[in-house]
Swiss-Prot record:
Phylogenetic placement of the source organism: Bacteria, Bacillati, Bacillota, Clostridia, Eubacteriales
Similarity section: Belongs to the SfsA family.
Cystine residue pairs: none
CDD domains: SfsA-like_bacterial
Gene name in the database record: sfsA
Protein name: Sugar fermentation stimulation protein homolog
Amino acid sequence: MKYTNIREGQFLSRPNRFIAKVEIDGKEEICHVKNTGRCRELLIPGVTVFLQEADFEHRKTKYDLIGVRKGNRLINMDSQVPNKVFCEWLEKGYFQELQHIKQEQTFRNSRFDFYLEAGQRKIFVEVKGVTLEEEGVALFPDAPTERGVKHLRELSQAVAAGYEAYVVFIIQMKDIHYFTPNIKTHQAFGDALIQADKQGVKILALDCEVTEDSIEAGDFVTVKLVEG
């Protein structure tokens, strides 16, 4: 996926989860943060950030904050992009005979990101974006997510009902050793992921090639599940 109108700046502060103050060409600007997660390990005063300049006038903010540099690693933190990355990745043929793609498909009490049909296979997919990294390990979630736990339980129910089910973690950066659930932040999510795995939900993790103005799915990353 490509972005346009990218500007480089320095992060100053984050008054709330929706906006941030940044400096661009020596001028302070208010920007929209395209990720309502905590991102405390990323948005540190003085770090280099990448912003997309809006192409229409009637907005409260002129820029969207989409990326940040953390050491030598460039991280895309746009929470709207993982589904788009997954859609593009589908074109590479992981699901053979793919003939139908529908976004936002309801199953019982959940709405999953994708419903696929490939030959005789009927598949639900839930996509999760990952921006949290510690010492080369990708972690999800970065905050407690009861909604995420609910999705995992209902993916398991979909398997029991005869569907295939996947949870796909799109790691929005490169150079990752492995992915693991962040049990320090939300033990229940880690437990639910282990149970989903045991009940037949397939778990995939993909890293991404990230530049200042693009993001594309890269390689599979090892998934490590640890009993709590």
